[in-house]
Amino acid sequence: MKVGVIAGGISSEREVSLRSGQAVFNALKELGYDVVFIDAGIDLCEKIKIEKIDIAFLVLHGGWGENGAVQGMLEVMGIPYTGSGVLASALAMDKEASKKIFLYHGIPVPPFKVLNKKDYISSAVSLSSFSFPCVVKPAEEGSSIGVNIVKNEREFKNAINEAFQFGKRVIIEKFIEGREIHIGVLGDKALGGVEVRPKKGFYSYEAKYTKGLTEYILPPEIDNALYEKLKELGLKAHKSLNCKGGTRVDMIVDQQGNPYVLEVNTIPGMTETSLLPKIASLAGYDFKGLVKEILELSLKNNEK
C-alpha cells in the first residue's frame, strides 16, 4: 500500500501545512509504510496520477485543502483519504454554516452576526448595531488568520477590512471572557483536552506556531464534571457535522463555567507545537501512534 502525504497547498496556511506534512511523512516512514510526499498545487491531480498512491493522508490546512474540494477530487479519482468527507469538511470550514448546525443540535456558541462584503461596501449595515468588545473573523479561514478582538469602532473598521481580504463574509462574535480549551476527537472518542494560555493577547497564528509564546495546561485545570462535559460537547460537535478521523474542537469557557463551541478543525495541525498530538498523549498515543490510528481509521471507514 502506497501512502501519499498531501500537504502545502496555496492557502494562507501553506507553511504550517508543509511542517505538519513533513512530520507525518517522517512518522509513516519510520512505521515502515511505502510513503511519498506530495506538495499540493494546481497540478495536484496530475501528481497523484504519477505517484499512483493507494490512499491519501491529508495534511492540508485552509482553502481548498480543507473545505471539501480536494476530498471531492479524490472521491472522483477513487482514492480513499484520511479525515472527514466532502460535506463535513465544507461545513466545518464555513463558520456561519457550522454555527447554525451547532445551534440546531443544542450546542452553545457565542452570539454572532454575519456581515456580507456587498452590504458593508454599500453602507447597508449600521456599525452601531454591533457592541464591543467583539471578535471579528473571516467566515472561511483557519489558524486564527484574519482574527481580531476589537474594543472600539476604529479597531472594528480595521478588523473588518482585514477579514474581508480572506473572503466575502465576516463573522462578528460576542467576545467571551474566559478560558480557551481544545478537545481532541479521534473516530468516535473524545481523547481529552488542553487549555491554552497565550503569554500575550489571544491564541493568534503567531502564538499557535511559535515556541514559547503559549503555555499549555494538559489536561486543563478544571473540575472533573466540567471536563467530562467539555469532552461530551466536543464529541457532539464532531458528530453534528459528521466528521471522521481526528479533529480538534475549540471552545471558550466563561467565568461562570459555561462552555461555548467556536469551531471544529477537520485537519488539525500536526507540528511539534500542535494541539491534537499533545491531547492524544493523554490517551496513550505517541506521535507515530496517532498518525497510524488516523490512517487505520480511514481504511476502516473506506471498507464500510
Curated annotation (Swiss-Prot):
SUPFAM superfamilies attached to this UniProt entry: Glutathione synthetase ATP-binding domain-like (SSF56059), PreATP-grasp domain (SSF52440)
Binding site for ATP: 127-182
UniProt-annotated binding residues for Mg(2+) 1: D250, E263
Subcellular location: Cytoplasm
Enzyme's top EC category: ligase
Transmembrane segments: none
GO cellular component terms, A-Z: cytoplasm
UniProt keyword terms in alphabetical order: ATP-binding, Cell shape, Cell wall biogenesis/degradation, Cytoplasm, Ligase, Magnesium, Manganese, Metal-binding, Nucleotide-binding, Peptidoglycan synthesis
Listed PROSITE patterns: ATP_GRASP, DALA_DALA_LIGASE_1, DALA_DALA_LIGASE_2
Signal peptide: none
EC number: 6.3.2.4
InterPro entries (UniProt xref): ATP-grasp, ATP_grasp_subdomain_1, D-Ala_lig_Van_CS, D_ala_D_ala, Dala_Dala_lig_C, Dala_Dala_lig_N, PreATP-grasp_dom_sf
Pfam families: Dala_Dala_lig_C (PF07478), Dala_Dala_lig_N (PF01820)
Binding residues for Mg(2+) 2: E263, N265
Entry-linked Gene3D superfamilies: 3.40.50.20, ATP-grasp fold, A domain, ATP-grasp fold, B domain
Pathway as given in its UniProt record: Cell wall biogenesis; peptidoglycan biosynthesis
Domain ATP-grasp, chain residue ranges per copy: 99-296
Note on cofactor: Binds 2 magnesium or manganese ions per subunit.
Stored HAMAP family: Dala_Dala_lig
Function: Cell wall formation.
Name the UniProt record assigns to this protein: D-alanine--D-alanine ligase
Organism taxonomic ancestry: Bacteria, Pseudomonadati, Nitrospirota, Thermodesulfovibrionia, Thermodesulfovibrionales
